[in-house]
Amino acid sequence: MSEKMVAIMKTKPAYGAELVEVDVPKPGPGEVLIKVIATSICGTDLHIYEWNEWAQSRIKPPQIMGHEVAGEVVEVGPGVEGIEVGDYVSVETHIVCGKCYACRRGQYHVCQNTKIFGVDTDGVFAEYAVVPAQNVWKNPKSIPPEYATLQEPLGNAVDTVLAGPISGKSVLITGAGPLGLLGIAVAKASGAYPVIVSEPSDFRRELAKKVGADYVINPFEEDVVKEVMDITDGNGVDVFLEFSGAPKALEQGLQAVTPAGRVSLLGLYPGKVSIDFNNLIIFKALTVYGITGRHLWETWYTVSRLLQSGKLNLDPIITHKYKGFDKYEEAFELMRAGKTGKVVFMLK
């Protein structure tokens, strides 16, 4: 193994990133070193690349970017048990304390002292990465690396879609970005019908169809609520899944969901949102879930089994694959332009 490696690094507090050569890290106690096979770009990585307000408040350059990964364990640090060299793995990004009130109740996904791998630590946009052993997930060999690297965001989609019953339910999904597309795949694999998708981008509406959406709506040109009511015989949808983070989409979805329906919110909003709680939530007796992270480790088992079942249609979602990191700038600019689904760097 070489002593040097290539990595995409946020080298300074400004727009962009650099491809640099750095030392291969050594795993310490409770850590493992993985050789990266595949790694994918998340919206969080794009925020860091763009150096937006959130990134400026959280990221401390210089730092290796990236957190979605599939790789092979090549070295095990002192004190690590149950993980061996050669294991094919992915990584849960929430590094939890195990001691706070939430953790002691088994609610690790809302740990009050969470650190994010690849945000608060060096990440996986590199040929090798050091990972906390407690965050390692072993993958079945049957799952290809370009799918295995998507398990972390896929877990977000699974928790959003499966927060309540979904089989045989009518569904509205607002936002067909990468997470929304994963949500479509999970909803279809889980027996939802019809799956209606509201998305302003022509490119992403076409992707939504390829993934399995039964109906697509352009909210800039069509009346979303009217279209949903027409499709559902005036009843509204049983389940509303909000992936966009657009306040207008939230309002439209709450109007379009049937009384006593279920709402799952994953999209993050730019600020405070004004909602008619009385008429859109309380008097409709809606059940509303806020979704963050993934349930550890229940969601990972669900994700892995869905992938192994062969029922998830993910190929249309992976719109771009790059061999290595050389074209990382092109990849990020395409994402900024909204012209991608998931972007995957393949290192093997």
From Swiss-Prot:
Superkingdom of this protein's organism: Archaea
Cited SMART domains: PKS_ER
Pathway membership, UniProt: Amino-acid degradation; L-threonine degradation via oxydo-reductase pathway; glycine from L-threonine: step 1/2
Active site location: T44 (charge relay system), H47 (charge relay system)
GO cellular component: cytoplasm
UniProt xrefs under CDD domains: TDH
Main location: cytoplasm
Cofactor section: Zn(2+)
Binding residue positions for Zn(2+) 1: C42, H67, E68
Transferase keyword on record: no
E.C. code: 1.1.1.103
GO biological process entries: L-threonine catabolic process to glycine; protein tetramerization
Site (Important for catalytic activity for the proton relay mechanism but does not participate directly in the coordination of zinc atom): E152
Recorded GO MF terms: adenyl nucleotide binding; anion binding; L-threonine 3-dehydrogenase activity; zinc ion binding
Subunit: Homotetramer.
Name of the protein: L-threonine 3-dehydrogenase
Species this chain originates from: Pyrococcus abyssi (strain GE5 / Orsay)
Gene: tdh
